[in-house]
Amino acid sequence: MFVIKRNGYKENVMFDKITSRIRKLCYGLNTDHIDPIKIAMKVIQGIYNGVTTVELDTLAAEIAATCTTQHPDYAILAARIAISNLHKETKKLFSEVMEDLFNYVNPKNGKHSPIISSITMDIVNKYKDKLNSVIIYERDFSYNYFGFKTLEKSYLLKINNKIVERPQHMLMRVAVGIHQWDIDSAIETYNLLSEKWFTHASPTLFNAGTTRHQMSSCFLLNMIDDSIEGIYDTLKRCALISKMAGGIGLSISNIRASGSYISGTNGISNGIIPMLRVYNNTARYIDQGGNKRPGVMAIYLEPWHSDIMAFLDLKKNTGNDEHRTRDLFIALWIPDLFMKRVKDDGEWSLMCPDECPGLDNVWGDEFERLYTLYERERRYKCIIKARVVWKAIIESQIETGTPFILYKDACNKKSNQQNLGTIKCSNLCTEIIQYADANEVAVCNLASVALNMFVIDGRFDFLKLKDVVKVIVRNLNKIIDINYYPIPEAEISNKRHRPIGIGVQGLADAFILLNYPFDSLEAQDLNKKIFETIYYGALEASCKLAEKEGPYDTYVGSYASNGILQYDLWNVVPSDLWNWEPLKDKIRTYGLRNSLLVAPMPTASTAQILGNNESVEPYTSNIYTRRVLSGEFQVVNPHLLRVLTERKLWNDEIKNRIMVDGGSIQNTNLPEDIKRVYKTIWEIPQKTIIKMAADRGAFIDQSQSMNIHIADPSYSKLTSMHFYGWSLGLKTGMYYLRTKPASAPIQFTLDKDKIKPQVVCDSEICTSCSG
């Protein structure tokens, strides 16, 4: 039996050679648990005549990955095999890879079709010796197997469908794409990215340095006008943004309701549902980022709109397809008055914006005055109990996980962009709160800090966190200036207001590394101090940039220009970790370069790349299933697996018990200290999660993607959570509602072959916000 080598030559299969290759990659791993011969034997079983060495490496990596539940070092070995394979298939020098990408010729038409931009190529040519010399390829081997596979699938650039970039090449491309001729800053950014201190958002990783360097994640639009022209002009904007890999939030509260008169045609409106069907089909038609993910939009509506009940049914699995838009996400922009009426079991008037104009343009007391005026003038379409609408909201959430909920008054009251006008919607992932109008499309550029990295020698390094945040602020400001904007209205907005969004990933990992239970007082205190540090560092860096380049155009009249920062709007006094008053004085003197700074986003894909838990979330399970080409296998929380292995507590019985219990360790006989630290989201009081969101909210000047997890949701449970979040002043009340399946098959045995652990969804619904 023979294999085909990379050079095309045939060679007889040699077991010892396969074993030797695997053994070479086991350096530094626990040899008591890692068995190269076992891996090699399984590889031999999968061999066929004419198999390539590339295919052998791929198989060996997958086999090693399937052994991860035996020892965490198998995951490292799997990644090393896969990355070593890539290194053998790609050029080493960064400059040569960039040349290949620039010199690409389309094989179908013979035309020069560069993948990277001419300016990127010019910079690389000028500084190639320096750039080539600072890249450290060993850092590629720090990715775990699934992080690397995520990069391989969507992030590393290809020529004729063959990957040509290594992870380090990608990171240097991103750094050079952002900083261009400022080569020292590019190298600083490269090192921080490759050491995993932070990551830029997916669109930045996809597109930095390329010919279409669209690096922004989020776009927020208002419907231009309640007319055919306005609706279709807005649709075109959405299509152009979606084409360039942007996630969209769209407010439609100004579109007239069904049954309303249309004076131009002397007809009757069909309302928002047929219009949204058109938007739904546009989202389906456009594949963002060259099939890296499908087009996605979140549609925002205020609950006084008389089409609200039909809107709440849009994503349901049953019902007439003519009244469904299952490819759009639905979201509510809820005024406080509605919550008060629900709380008091009051009546609620449903209105048409054509007959009751201006409700979407006002908030707070002004909204209440206008709304109650329209009620007194009997301009409403109908009156129903507020709780009827509320019940429909809860039912939709239990069935579909949506609508997302944001509180209009909190979003406007606590926004540093309040001086611009009324904010009417958020984005696709509910963490961006920015002003938009008919002439401006709000944009946000994102990055996320890997909090686990800052746990050094058993303590959290706040000073290092602040320093990294300051680099991120400088980077995101450069992105604003050099970005390719899909539409001019987005460029106008972004350069006037200069908002950015700094988020986090690995909060749960940081707590685990410090041995803090997620719901402990220590974790709750650290949660506040982390976000206080991020906000402080971001303000400090933005003020420094303003000193050099001037404040953003619309700074005058903002809260910050009057010495009011986010925590002041929450009536919170910061800790004594940082000295706030001198910073406020500096801001009064020089201003800020950015209107907004902090926005914890979901980090779905980038957290997987870096091997961290997502965003600010606790772990949802301690064991889950991954799907690969060779089949399915189980992955255990790596922190748990390591501690159990070190304490000689890991065995098949424990593994099977965790699988039977859906990823929980609470029913095992493990020590109590381990049980406390490794609680899943389902075992942590949801009100603690919401309280921690409010605690950090005082230092988040945008908002945060906050999911609500209720294993078995009911009207009363979900209502209680929503009203608790609203009462604490949250801007985002809920991103998704996450639930457990209604029933699970009865487990009659602990036989691992008969146990179905939680399957991780590999959907990339919100890659655009994965910072």
Swiss-Prot record:
It is an enzyme of class 1 (oxidoreductase). The keyword ATP-binding applies. GDP binds at residues 202, 217, 427, 431, 603-606. One of its GO terms (molecular function) is ribonucleoside-diphosphate reductase activity, thioredoxin disulfide as acceptor. Residues 1-92 form the ATP-cone domain. One of its GO terms (biological process) is deoxyribonucleotide biosynthetic process. Gene3D superfamilies: 3.20.70.20. DTTP binds at residues 226-228, 243, 256. ATP binds at residues 5-6, 11-17, 53, 57, 88. It catalyses: a 2'-deoxyribonucleoside 5'-diphosphate + [thioredoxin]-disulfide + H2O = a ribonucleoside 5'-diphosphate + [thioredoxin]-dithiol. Disulfide bonds: none annotated. Its EC number is 1.17.4.1. PANTHER family: RIBONUCLEOSIDE-DIPHOSPHATE REDUCTASE LARGE CHAIN, RIBONUCLEOSIDE-DIPHOSPHATE REDUCTASE LARGE SUBUNIT. Ribonucleoside-diphosphate reductase holoenzyme provides the precursors necessary for viral DNA synthesis. Allows virus growth in non-dividing cells. Catalyzes the biosynthesis of deoxyribonucleotides from the corresponding ribonucleotides. This is Ribonucleoside-diphosphate reductase large subunit. The gene is OPG080.
